[in-house]
Amino acid sequence: ILAVASNKYQSATVKLISHYFPNIRFTAVFGQREGVNVKPDPTVVHDILDITRISREDVLYVGDSGVDMQTAANAGVTACGVTWGFRPRTELEEFHPAHIVDNAADIAVIAAL
């Protein structure tokens, strides 16, 4: 199961995901929504967990920023930082995620564990 949790506005998030990942079926695509606190508040992750009925222990939260690592920690899920995003590796390391990867193939390996 794949889902998106973004701090971009909801309409922009949906548009970007549809454009860049047209062949991937996401269970949920959430951006900023009225009345919902933005990350690192864990509400968006909790909303996804409610929809998917997946336990926190089975989640790998993949992100490219310290805010993402904080969100994962706040939600009680496993964090995986990716080094090809907008923030430097050092920012990810500050939050001590369970994993930091340098390429997408490594995510599949971690998810299979």
Locate the predicted segments by residue.
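Asp-based, Mg2+/Mn2+-dependent phosphohydrolase catalytic module
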Residues: 10, 14-113
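Conserved phosphate-coupling serine/threonine residues in phosphotransfer and NTP-handling enzymes
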Residues: 6-8
